Amino acid sequence: MRSNENRAISIVQKDIEGNIFECTEGLSFWGGVDPKTGCIIDIHHPDHGTCLSDKFVLMPTSRGSCSGSGVLLQLAQNGLAPAAIIFNEMEEILTLGAIVADQLFKKKVAILRVPRDLYSALAMADKAEICENRLMFGSKTIKLRKLNIDTVNLNSKDKSILDGNHGAAQQIAMETICKMAVIQNANELIDVTKGHIDGCILAHDANLIFAEKMHQLGARISIQTTINAISVNRDNWQRQGVKPDFGNKASRLADAYVKMGAQPTYTCAPYLLENIPKEQEVIGWSESNAVIYANSILGAKTQKHPDYF
């Protein structure tokens, strides 16, 4: 049996301390946490009303919408994020949000994945601290293993991107992809031929800030990529009584992706467009219904990716 120290992984590192709060059930941050307050607003969740800000939040894994990554980024931007989120199962949505917050904006939310026995011991404690890659609570001190992206075998082009030879945006994207690969226990990457971007609605300013930051850094889309539905009728919102501040921000969000090379499709149903994926074609789609349709009806292959991925 491996020791807890070998199995406790620090995915996003931050020296921080705080009170421990155990979520009795998994939580969807999208629709479940208010990014303006940090409180749980899902009335069906047993911890409804609890504020997660500055706490060491324990939950087995998250659940629900892949847009939860954006909510965590907005919480980090607002200074209302949990101090740390600790999982004992595979988790990608909030993890990706924390990676993006760190990589692009230097807003850290500590993310750990620990074995279940250590998780249970943490749940019995009142406070915890992370310092110099060690987790401390009660009388215990656990050494945390850093995420090691060197375990991912890259081809020469991907290595060059990771080394920063193709610009900052590409380097950040490749490092993020490699981190997510390690989280999934993957040891190599597979090229995809098509993409579909979610996170295009102006649910909060984080979606806009992310897209414009990537464009500012020089990001360019390199495969056929479509865009999900947006928050306004791009051409007619001014005539529909939409408030100018909201309409302008929603338009800027859509325009940022188009400027990076995405097709202005603005649909949740990319499978109804021309040049749809073929059977066995490996693609990278977001938007839950599109992922289900692609895998089950078209026979293509895609994961359900979190927003920003």
How would you label these PLM feature ranges?
Residues 30-38, 56-63, 166-176, 210-219, ...:
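Phosphate-binding glycine-rich loops and adjacent basic patches that engage nucleotide phosphates
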Residues 144-151, 182-188, 220-230, 279-289:
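Short, compositionally biased low-complexity segments
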Residues 99-114, 127, 136, 227-308:
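A generic, well-ordered mixed alpha/beta core segment in the N-terminal half of proteins
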Residues 2-136, 231:
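Feature captures the catalytic cores and cofactor-binding loops of soluble hydro-lyases/lyases
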Residues 33-38, 67-74, 100, 143-145, ...:
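Surface-exposed beta-strand edges and their flanking turn/coil or helix-capping segments
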Residues 66, 70-73, 81-84, 88, ...:
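Glycine-rich, N-terminal phosphate-binding loop and its surrounding beta-alpha-beta segment
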Residues 15-16, 49-53, 78-81, 214-218, ...:
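Flexible, charged surface loops at secondary-structure boundaries
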Residues 2-26, 138-217, 303:
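N-terminal basic/disordered segments at the start of proteins
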